[in-house]
A protein has these predicted regions:
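The canonical Cys-X-X-Cys-His
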Residues: 203
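Short linker/helix segments within small regulatory modules
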Residues: 191-199
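Short, non-ligating residues that shape and space the ligands of small metal-coordination modules
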Residues: 191-192, 207-212
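Basic, polyanion-binding surface patches
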Residues: 1-177, 181-184, 189
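Short beta-strand-to-coil "C-cap" segments at the C-terminal boundary of structured domains/repeats
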Residues: 152-153, 211-215
Length: 215
């Protein structure tokens, strides 16, 4: 039986920004949808992060991480910054509101945060699963948590290439004969030409990072 990877989108999961600090003191962060509470006493959760992400190295180095809970009113600029750029060459925290707590950056535009100390890891072929024990947790502001399904179906967001649920074939349904595809995140703009001053609503890059698709 073939595996229909689109079925992953039917799994109920939220969207989070995992943040940590690397061995050089640099703040790192990335968007994940694979975070799960595994126990309540002691309170523990696990998160899966692609090994190529700088955030995975940071969590391994610092032995701690913060999960900021994203809500449905989270801006696409925030998701694009943390989902489609690398902390190795981008200061993701430069233009966002955050506060430091227990040595970790907390996204102030999130609906809440969970701080964990690392207690164990498990390696897969592409991802490291981090098991953390919760040391602090707080609601920042009211808001409906954003689910992975809401991100895809309502916002029409794409998955970063390092996400466990990334599908290389992700594209918009056939419609216009000319479309423009973002070479960073895969967002599809229907129609031609691109509007003047156009920026990708997902990752924020300009029109120069779009390629024309003729069907």
């Amino acid at each position: 039986m073939e595996i229909d990877r689109k079925a992953f989108r039917s799994l109920s999961s939220g969207l989070y920004i995992i943040s940590s600090i690397d061995a050089d003191g640099r703040l790192c962060g990335c968007v994940v949808n694979t975070l799960l509470q595994v126990a309540s006493d002691p309170a523990q959760l696990l998160v899966s992060i692609n090994k190529q992400n700088a955030t995975a190295d940071a969590v391994s180095a610092s032995k701690r991480f913060c999960a900021s809970v994203l809500s449905q009113d989270t801006t696409m600029d925030l998701i694009g910054t943390f989902g489609f750029h690398s902390s190795r060459d981008t200061d993701k925290f430069k233009d966002i509101r955050f506060e430091m707590q227990d040595g970790l950056p907390i996204i102030q535009d999130a609906s809440g945060f969970i701080i964990c100390k690392l207690i164990d890891t498990m390696e897969t072929a592409t991802h490291t699963i981090f098991l953390g024990e919760i040391t602090a947790m707080e609601a920042i502001r009211p808001g409906t948590p954003m689910t992975y399904s809401y991100y895809h179906k309502v916002i029409k967001g794409k998955s970063p290439k390092n996400a466990p649920t990334y599908q290389p074939q992700e594209e918009a349904d056939a419609g216009s004969s000319i479309r423009w595809k973002c070479m960073i995140c895969g967002y599809i703009y229907e129609g031609d030409p691109l509007p003047e001053g156009f920026k990708c609503p997902i990752c924020g890059v300009g029109a120069d990072m779009f390629e024309k698709i003729i069907t």
